């Protein structure tokens, strides 16, 4: 009788262990989906801010070299990581607009500053670069990984001649893609500021896994409305 009780206890324990492994497995499988839903939720909140005209004015500051080094460190760190880091930081609320690239079905909020927190849910404007619609070179960066939703994952599909629209609180700026190329992370020439005209420069990692370069998409302003 005692032996039978022991066998029943062992079976019961094994059932609980099996159930525990099932729960853990479901958690691992569902985590990317839950995380992507959270990112989508944060993006929707930011886009609704734009509709409510809660848009912030921006101005240039700090050295471009320092800002680009900081951006490269963030892009490389996130690309090398295989798990989402634990953080209580929230993206800053300084929404400056949204970006649409219809050719790749992309619509994303744009936040002022390419910080780690901002780039988890949105496109970040590199501080010290131009302002959308004005004379200068506006540098916008985003991740190209599978951890934070889609973001710039399909940026390599953009072609010369494609349209990019930047909407701020008062205006919509239409840019036309003129160049798509790759550079080393240390190449600062992509941030060169023109004396005339408004340029848009999109920056992300390339390739998605173990990136060695930066994928660059540059476009020129063709219409303001």
Predicted regions located by residue number:
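N-terminal Lys/Arg-rich, disordered targeting/topogenic segments
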Residues: 1-10
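Solvent-exposed, non-transmembrane regions of membrane-associated and secreted proteins
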Residues: 10-15, 21-225
């Amino acid at each position: 009788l005692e032996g039978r009780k022991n066998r029943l206890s062992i079976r019961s324990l094994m059932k609980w262990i099996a159930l525990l492994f099932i729960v853990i497995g479901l958690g691992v499988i569902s985590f990317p989906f839950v995380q992507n839903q959270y990112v989508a939720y944060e993006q929707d909140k930011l886009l609704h801010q734009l509709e409510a005209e809660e848009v912030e004015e921006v101005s240039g500051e700090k050295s471009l070299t320092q800002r680009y080094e900081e951006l490269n460190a963030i892009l490389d760190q996130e690309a090398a990581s295989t798990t989402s880091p634990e953080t209580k930081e929230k993206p800053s609320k300084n929404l400056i607009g949204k970006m649409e690239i219809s050719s790749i079905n992309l619509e994303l909020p744009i936040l002022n500053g390419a910080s780690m927190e901002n780039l988890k849910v949105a496109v970040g404007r590199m501080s010290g670069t131009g302002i959308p619609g004005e004379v200068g070179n506006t540098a916008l960066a985003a991740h190209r990984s599978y951890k934070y939703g889609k973001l710039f994952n399909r940026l390599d599909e953009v072609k010369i001649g494609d349209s990019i629209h930047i909407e701020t609180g008062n205006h919509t700026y239409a840019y036309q893609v003129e160049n798509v190329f790759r550079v080393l992370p240390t190449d600062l020439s992509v941030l060169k500021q023109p004396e005339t005209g408004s340029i848009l420069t999109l920056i992300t990692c390339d390739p998605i896994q173990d990136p060695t370069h930066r994928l660059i998409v540059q476009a020129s302003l063709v219409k303001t409305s």
